[in-house]
Design a protein with these regions (language model features):
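Membrane-proximal intracellular helices of multi-pass ion channels
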Residues: 1-481
Length: 481
C-alpha cells in the first residue's frame, strides 16, 4: 500500500479545512464573539500539520490505486471531523469532545442529527461553522480538492468514485478534474440563487447563508430551535423547492446546461424521484388534513416540505411529524430508506438502486414463471449489466446487515424500538431526526457514548456508501504481505 499518497491527500484536506475556518473567524469578528479566536488557533495547527503531511507525502509520491483511494477518502472524512470539532470543545460551547465530534460528523456527512437541545445557545460563528460543514460535505471535500488541486486523472477517479454517492460515477467531460469543477460550479450556482431568493423574501443575510448551506448539502442543521417553523411560508416554500432540486442527480443539470433536454426528461431515476415525491405528498396531505381542521392548502404545504426534507435526507422541519398518524409516519420511514438520487447531495439507499432492485426482482419472478424467456433489465433505455445488478444487490445486503447490527448495539441503551430503529435509520441514511425521543422535537444527547460512536460510524458509512469505511476497518487492509 502506498501510504505516502494517502498522507499527501490528508495534508491537502487539512490545508483546505484550515482555509475554510477563516470564514467562521470572519463571522466572529463581525459579531465580536470571543469564541471565534479558537478557530484561529485550530486553523493554524491544522495548516501546520497539513503542510508537514503535504511535504512528507509529496516526496517520491507514486500512483494511487483503488485501495489507496478508499482509505484516503475514509481517513479524510474522519480527520476533517476530528479537527472541525475542536473549536466547539476548546471554546466550551460543546464541553464533551465526543459530543462535538458527533456534531461535526453529522455536519460533514450532511446528516443533521444533533446533540444540542437548544441550538440558539451557540454563538453565531459556531452556528455558521455547523452550517458550512453541510455545504462542504454536500458535494464532498475531495471533490472540492480535485477542483482546486492538480492531480493525475487516474488518481482523481479513485478519489471521486470512493466519495461520490450512487451506484456508478461517470465522467461528464473527458478530464476528471474538469468534471469536479463543473459539479462545484452547478452546486455553487444553485446555492447563490437560493440565497438571493431568501434575501428577496426579507430573511437576514446570516439566516439566508446558513439555511442555504444546509439545504444545498441536504444537511438540516437549523439555526433556530424550532428549525423552520417560525420562518415565513415564502421561506418554507423556497426551501421545499430547493431541497427537492438538490436531491436530483447533478448530471441532469449538466444535460440542461448543454440543452440536452430529452436526456434529462427521459432519465428513469428522475421520473421515479418526482413520482415518489408527488404521490407521497398527496397521500400524507389527505392523511393529516383532519389534524389541521380540513385545511387542504395548509396540509399540502407542510406535507410537501416534510416529504422533500425526508426523501432528500435534509431533515429540516416545519411540523413535528412524529405526532402525525401512523400511516404518514410509515411513509416517511420508507422515504428515509429510499433517499434521494444518485449523484446528488442526498443520502439514503438512492432511487437508482431501488429501481434496479425492483426491476431485478420483477425479472427473477418472470424467469420463474417463464424459464425460457430472457428478460433484460433496462434503465434509461439501456441494458443494465449483470455486474451492476450484483453490485447493487451486494450493497443492499451489506446495508441491511450493517443496519441490523447497529440497531442491536444501540438497543443496549434500553430505549423504545421506535427511537432505536429510527435513530439508526436517521444516521445511516444521513437524514437527521428520527422518531420518538430522537424525533423532530428531540435530539441525540441522551444516547450512551457507545451508541454515539456506533451512530457516528453509521453516518460515515452512509455518506461514503459503505466501502471506504469497511476497507478502512478491515484488519486485512493493514496486514503486511
Amino acid at each position: 500500500m502506498n501510504k505516502r499518497v494517502i498522507v499527501y491527500v490528508l495534508g491537502a484536506v487539512l490545508l483546505i479545512e484550515a482555509a475554510l475556518m477563516l470564514l467562521p473567524l470572519l463571522v466572529a469578528v463581525i459579531y465580536r464573539e470571543r469564541t471565534g479566536w479558537y478557530f484561529l488557533w485550530v486553523l493554524l495547527g491544522a495548516a501546520a500539520l497539513g503542510a508537514l503531511a503535504l511535504g512528507l507525502g509529496g516526496r517520491k509520491r507514486s500512483a494511487m490505486y483503488a485501495k489507496e483511494g478508499l482509505i484516503a477518502v475514509a481517513l479524510s472524512w474522519i480527520v476533517l471531523s476530528l479537527v472541525g470539532a475542536l473549536p466547539f470543545t476548546l471554546s466550551g460551547q460543546i464541553p464533551f469532545y465526543l459530543d462535538a465530534v458527533f456534531e461535526m460528523i453529522s455536519g460533514f456527512t450532511t446528516t443533521g442529527s444533533s446533540i444540542l437541545p437548544a441550538v440558539e445557545s451557540l454563538d453565531r460563528c459556531m452556528l455558521f461553522w455547523r452550517s458550512l460543514s453541510h455545504w462542504i460535505g454536500g458535494m464532498g471535500i475531495l471533490v472540492f480538492m480535485l477542483a482546486i488541486v492538480r492531480m493525475d486523472g487516474g488518481q482523481a477517479i479513485h478519489l471521486l468514485r470512493a466519495e461520490s454517492p450512487g451506484p456508478t460515477v461517470s465522467k461528464m467531460v473527458p478530464r476528471m478534474v474538469d468534471s469536479s469543477k463543473i459539479l462545484y460550479g452547478i452546486y455553487f450556482g444553485l446555492t447563490v440563487v437560493q440565497i438571493i431568493l431568501y434575501l428577496a423574501g426579507g430573511d437576514p443575510l446570516f439566516d439566508s447563508l446558513c439555511n442555504a448551506f444546509g439545504t444545498a448539502g441536504t444537511g438540516g442543521f437549523a439555526i433556530r430551535n424550532d428549525s423552520f417553523a417560525s420562518y415565513s411560508a415564502y421561506t418554507q416554500t423556497v426551501t421545499t423547492v430547493f431541497m427537492a432540486l438538490f436531491g436530483v442527480n447533478f448530471s441532469i443539470y449538466f444535460f440542461l446546461l448543454r440543452r440536452k433536454f430529452d436526456l434529462a426528461w427521459k432519465n428513469t431515476e428522475l421520473r421515479w424521484y418526482v413520482s415518489i415525491i408527488v404521490i407521497s405528498t398527496l397521500l400524507i396531505t389527505f392523511n393529516i388534513k383532519s389534524l389541521y381542521h380540513g385545511d387542504f392548502g395548509y396540509s399540502l404545504h407542510h406535507a410537501a416540505f416534510t416529504v422533500s426534507s425526508v426523501i432528500t435526507t435534509t431533515g429540516y422541519g416545519t411540523e413535528n411529524f412524529d405526532l402525525w398518524p401512523e400511516f404518514s409516519r410509515v411513509i416517511l420511514v420508507l422515504l428515509m430508506i429510499v433517499g434521494a438520487s444518485a449523484g446528488s447531495t442526498g443520502g439514503g439507499l438512492k432511487v437508482s438502486r431501488v429501481v434496479i432492485l425492483m426491476r431485478a426482482a420483477k425479472a427473477e419472478l418472470r424467469k420463474i414463471l417463464h424459464p425460457h424467456t430472457v428478460k433484460v433489465i433496462t434503465v434509461d433505455g439501456k441494458p443494465v449489466s449483470g455486474e451492476t445488478v450484483r453490485a447493487v444487490s451486494t450493497y443492499f445486503i451489506l446495508y441491511v446487515l450493517i443496519a441490523a447490527a447497529s440497531v442491536l448495539l444501540v438497543s443496549l441503551d434500553g430505549y423504545d424500538g421506535s427511537t432505536t430503529l429510527t435513530a439508526v435509520l436517521a444516521t445511516f441514511n444521513n437524514i437527521g431526526p428520527g422518531l420518538g425521543l430522537c424525533g423532530p422535537a428531540g435530539n441525540f444527547a441522551f444516547f450512551s457514548p457507545l451508541a454515539k460512536v456506533v451512530l457516528c460510524i453509521d453516518m460515515l458509512l452512509g455518506r461514503l456508501e459503505l466501502y471506504p469505511m469497511l476497507v478502512l476497518l478491515m484488519p486485512s487492509t493493514w496486514r503486511k504481505k
